[in-house]
Curated annotation (Swiss-Prot):
Residue ranges, annotated region (Disordered): 24-105, 172-245, 289-316, 336-359, 467-486, 496-563, 576-637, 651-682, 697-729, 760-794, 818-859, 940-992
Residues found modified as Phosphoserine: S175, S320, S509, S604, S637, S775, S829, S838, S840
Comp. bias regions, Basic and acidic residues: 549-561, 577-595
Name this protein carries in UniProt: GYF domain-containing protein mpd2
Coiled coil spans: none
SMART domains (alphabetical): GYF
Polar residues bias spans: 25-58, 75-104, 214-237, 301-315, 337-348, 474-483, 507-532, 596-606, 658-676, 707-721, 825-859, 943-966
GO cellular component, one term: cytosol
One of the GO biological process terms: endoplasmic reticulum to Golgi vesicle-mediated transport
Organism this protein belongs to: Schizosaccharomyces pombe (strain 972 / ATCC 24843)
């Protein structure tokens, strides 16, 4: 019940209307001049109206009935019945007309003329009414100004709702039951929105009002298919016998082109909206749900055989409050541009809606915006006022953000060209305005179209088949057509990862699996041949034609299982911290492989045999792939370069060992078969690290046995080990030399290896001649020194290490001190010039046993070779506890002992600066003075031991030392003002 209905039902209008009616008939009444609107409201005039000259007299025979009927009619809201003005129009054809009012049946007979002859609706677009409408005349003679309804802009919809009897179509609305606002009103039925004022609400295209539209009853077609419109009669019992003739619900008004196939004589075209009256006995038989305005469409009347369902025009329920929502949805979706291309739901939604929704039987326009088929995704659309836009001006400056309303105003004003780069604030890439218009399908107001939220993939504009560049969305059909190949799109290509190493990370993703698999295949001793690799590559790339896509649906499942298995196996790979290289892991997958024959085969470091590997899971050979990738270009990696250089260097350094080793039958190497990553092609490796390590171990074993059997060589080695660890010209603080290679070879730089190996060859030749020149004191000291036992693993690359330890770098000249007169004063013997230097670039980690052995041996070397007493060394150890963490005490003390044992400025500054550089809590100057004093005192009391060490005595007392050069210089003044000349003043001199 609306508000107007409550006003009409609760107020007693009979007294007011009766008094107004009397005053309106009196020409001298002041009401006419004071309230002209009420005059025109209560006294409508027309050509044949109530107050017209032809019908101003009311029949006295019915005046008694009018008093009782007037009160009931006014109470129900039908004001025209109280004024004896029948508000309903009859047909222009008198043969079809019926009794118009139950209150006054004598006014119009079946053969008489109606009160309103030839009623039409005025063609007035300003929402006012002409005299022919018999409602409100804006140019009435009694009104001194314009009608108030016209001034206030009252819409036709408001007049129709407030005064329902003024727009009724069928007969019999004089009854208070039918004329009251509580009943349904028969109105024109079109598929247009009630809010669209410019659209015609009537199918009559003549002089009908496009705003209101009043339809007339058509002429009977003479067919027995339709019910009789004039079935009611005044003689029927019940007080209101003709009520049923017009009690039809408004939604039962159907239109069909089959109503009048041959047209009608009254000028109304075929297919016009009809008002079909149901028979008397069938009015109350309709179910309540069929009368509900929420139930829309032709499915409302599936059981009513008397109402034909037309196909030319869809039913429109103007009484339903849902029409407002539907109209808003039409405006949002831009029905004018997109009516032919609605948003297509998914296949499952279409199938479900086609089976279960009543809207499936509707016409396309009705089913598109019906309540059952309303698109659910419209609820998440963002209105234009909340959309934020950015655009780039001609100077490529970003402007914004602006709302969609502002962008629309500027677009309609012509400021935006079609090539303007625009984007939403949430999007990443710009696109042209023309592209945006094509996407929304609305050129007039593209910025007013509600848009969906921007996702991570920027798929707000992307439907299936669009070519938006900022989209990562793959259409469903493309995914289905790809079949078993769609999972391979994210995999890295073979050319990208063929020579890439990822040693420090475990296999947690597909790319890491590819990298680790490639590293394993490189470090293994198997080399997969080209044919097998091509087969595995074709199998991995989903090698099948488009016709066989659905036959290989198990291919991605198989690959996923293999990937999971590979990830589990790769997770167990242990990485060595010392060498940063992988161990070849054993895969649990069953693999059939051919192994190396046990015959005599010489393995060259430049090339190795190729072993074909056949995967057990690959039972049938796949078809050749049309997308077969090009063979990757082989680039030598770091491991290959190192292994090649090591093999060449070792073969040159030890030719005799290589020759003796070649005579022995090699042990059959067990080949560990590997299944590489299915998408990566295994590249051939020239020399594997495992083979190099095994061959080096054999060579070192032979060398060890050969050296152990030769006592002369052992003596020379001991003599070399007895020399001072560091000389005056060597670099102190270098890392200690490795004694053993733990499990993997260290990554040595190839230029350093070449240089050291070349010098090692010369050093081996000099070892034989240098044995006889060794001092007996060194042999005795070396014999008394306990030798550290080498661990069992100290066999790998021992020869190379020993050569590096005892090698002499001849390319670097020793230091020569130039004395007075340009003479070299510290010329040493050739045996003394050959000093031992440790390589500074060798990186390794010693185990606990080796560290303890090297520490004890170095301490003993310091004690034995420096000539200092243990008391002095103990004081040095206690005093140097304040060194920073990470500073090696032995190396630092060895560096201090290599300095001249003299109390001069240079030695003092070097010691103090070294203390300041390696400690934050020690006093460098105090330690330098105390260290020099104690050292000189210790050496002067040990003359016998000092004479035994020739190199140390030359270092401290040689005339060619730095102290000898500095000693000849004149002594500089130590006063603070030594640079200035002091001038005494003359006392007796007078000033002028």
């Amino acid at each position: 019940m609306n508000s107007e209905a409550s006003v009409f039902s609760n107020m007693d209008w009979s007294q007011l209307a009766h008094s107004l009616h009397k005053k309106a008939n009196n020409s001298s009444s002041s009401t006419t001049g004071a309230f002209p609107q009420l005059t025109s409201f209560t006294k409508p005039t027309a050509t044949n109206g109530v107050d017209s000259p032809t019908s101003s007299h009311i029949d006295p025979s019915v005046s008694a009935k009018l008093d009782s009927q007037r009160k009931l009619s006014l109470k129900s809201g039908n004001m025209w019945d109280s004024l004896n003005a029948p508000s309903e129009l009859t047909s222009k054809n008198p043969t079809v007309s019926s009794t118009t009012s139950s209150a006054n049946p004598a006014i119009v007979s079946n053969g008489g003329s109606p009160f309103y002859k030839n009623p039409v609706v005025a063609n007035n677009p300003s929402s006012t009414f002409d005299m022919s409408t018999n409602l409100f005349n804006s140019k009435n003679a009694n009104t001194s100004f314009t009608n108030a309804f016209s001034n206030e802009g009252i819409s036709p919809g408001f007049l129709r709702d407030c005064f329902p009897s003024s727009n009724s179509i069928t007969t019999g609305t004089a009854s208070p039951k039918l004329g009251s606002p509580f009943n349904h009103i028969n109105r024109p039925v079109l598929d247009r929105s009630p809010s669209s004022f410019s659209q015609s609400r009537s199918a009559v295209s003549g002089n009908m009002n496009p705003g209101v539209g009043t339809l007339q009853q058509p002429q009977r077609a003479g067919s027995d298919t339709f019910p009789d419109l004039n079935t009611s009669s005044s003689n029927q019992p019940g007080g209101e016998p003709n009520v049923a003739s017009a009690n039809t619900h408004s939604l039962e008004i159907l239109s069909s082109s089959a109503y009048h196939p041959s047209g009608s004589s009254n000028g109304i075209s075929a297919g016009l909206t009809q008002s079909v009256a149901s028979p008397v006995g069938q009015v109350d038989n309709l179910a309540d749900f069929s009368q509900s305005p929420l139930r829309r469409g032709p499915s409302r009347f599936p059981t009513n055989s008397n109402v034909p369902v037309g196909n030319s025009m869809s039913i429109r329920d103007t009484d339903s409050p849902l029409n407002i929502l539907v109209d808003k949805a039409k405006a949002k979706a831009s029905i004018k541009e997109n009516a032919s291309q609605p948003v297509a739901p998914s296949a499952s939604q279409r199938e479900h809606s086609a089976v279960n929704s009543p809207a499936a039987a509707m016409s396309p326009s009705t089913a598109m915006f019906s309540s059952e088929a309303f698109p659910q995704h419209l609820a998440s659309l963002i209105p234009p006022a909340l959309l934020h836009w950015l655009y780039k001006d001609p100077q490529n400056n970003v402007q914004g953000p602006f709302t969609g309303v502002d962008m629309h105003q500027w677009y309609r004003a012509g400021y935006f060209p079609l090539g303007l780069p625009i984007k939403r604030l949430e999007e990443e890439e710009y696109y042209s305005l023309a592209f945006f218009i094509r996407q929304v399908g609305n050129q007039l107001e593209p910025f007013l179209v509600p848009l969906s939220p921007v996702t991570v993939q920027n798929a707000s504009w992307n439907a299936q088949g669009t070519d938006l560049p900022l989209s990562n969305y793959l259409p469903e059909s493309s995914e289905q057509n790809r079949g078993g190949n769609k999972h391979l799109e994210l995999y890295p290509s073979t050319a990208e990862v063929s020579n890439v190493r990822n040693d420090e990370s475990k296999a947690n993703s597909l790319s890491e699996i590819s990298y680790n698999q490639q590293s394993e295949c490189r470090s293994s001793e198997l080399n997969v041949n080209e044919d097998s690799a091509n087969q595995k590559e074709e199998s991995a790339l989903g090698t099948s034609d488009n016709s066989d896509m659905y036959e290989k649906e198990n291919t991605p499942i198989h690959h996923n299982e293999s990937l999971n298995q590979l990830s589990k196996d790769l997770g167990s790979i242990s990485l060595s911290e010392e060498t940063k290289q992988e161990k070849p892991s054993k895969l649990k997958e069953t693999v059939e492989s051919k192994r190396l024959s046990t015959g005599v085969q010489k393995q060259s470091p430049a090339a190795s045999k190729e072993i074909p590997v056949t995967s057990g899971s690959q039972t049938t050979a796949p078809k050749p792939s049309p997308w077969k990738s090009l063979p990757p270009k082989h680039l030598p990696s770091l491991d290959e370069t190192i292994s090649r250089e090591m093999s060449i260097a070792s073969s040159e350094a030890l030719p005799q060992v290589e020759k003796s080793n070649s005579d022995q039958p090699p042990v059959a190497i067990p080949s560990t078969s590997k299944t590489g990553s299915p998408w990566a092609k295994v590249s051939d490796v020239s020399t594997s690290m495992a083979q190099e390590i095994q061959r080096m171990e054999k060579q070192n074993e032979n060398l060890k046995s050969k050296v152990a059997s030769n006592p002369v060589s052992q003596t020379s080695t001991n003599a070399k080990a007895s020399t001072p660890a560091l000389a005056s010209g060597s670099i102190w603080g270098s890392p200690s030399v490795i004694n053993a290679w733990a499990n993997k070879p260290a990554a040595l730089k190839s230029p350093l290896i070449k240089k050291n190996i070349q010098q090692a060859e010369l050093a081996q030749n000099k070892q034989q001649s240098s044995v006889t020149t060794a001092s007996p004191r060194s042999n005795a000291l070396n014999a008394n020194t306990p030798k550290a036992a080498a661990p069992s693993s100290n066999v790998t690359m021992k020869n190379v290490t020993s050569i590096l330890e005892t090698s002499t770098f001849e390319g670097e000249d020793t230091w020569s001190v130039v004395g007075p007169g340009g003479k070299i004063v510290n010329q040493q013997s050739p045996s003394a010039q050959q000093t031992t230097r440790s390589p500074s670039k060798v990186s390794a980690t010693l185990n606990a046993g080796n560290s303890q052995a090297s520490t004890s041996s170095k301490l003993q070397q310091v004690v034995s070779m420096s000539g200092h007493s243990p008391d002095f060394l103990a004081w040095c150890k206690i005093s140097l506890k304040g060194l920073n963490e990470g500073v090696n005490y032995e190396e630092f003390l060895d560096m201090l002992l290599s300095l001249p044992a003299e109390n001069n400025v240079e030695t003092f500054e070097i010691i103090s600066d070294s203390i300041y550089a390696n400690s934050t809590i020690m006093d460098g100057r105090r330690f330098a003075s105390e260290f020099t004093r104690r050292r000189i005192a210790d050496l002067t009391g040990k003359d016998g031991q000092q004479s035994n060490n020739k190199s140390q005595s030359e270092l401290g007392n040689s005339s060619g030392a730095w102290s000898q050069v500095v000693r000849n210089k004149p002594k500089q003044g130590t006063e603070w003002n030594s640079a200035f000349k002091v001038v005494t003043s003359k006392k007796n001199k007078k000033r002028v």
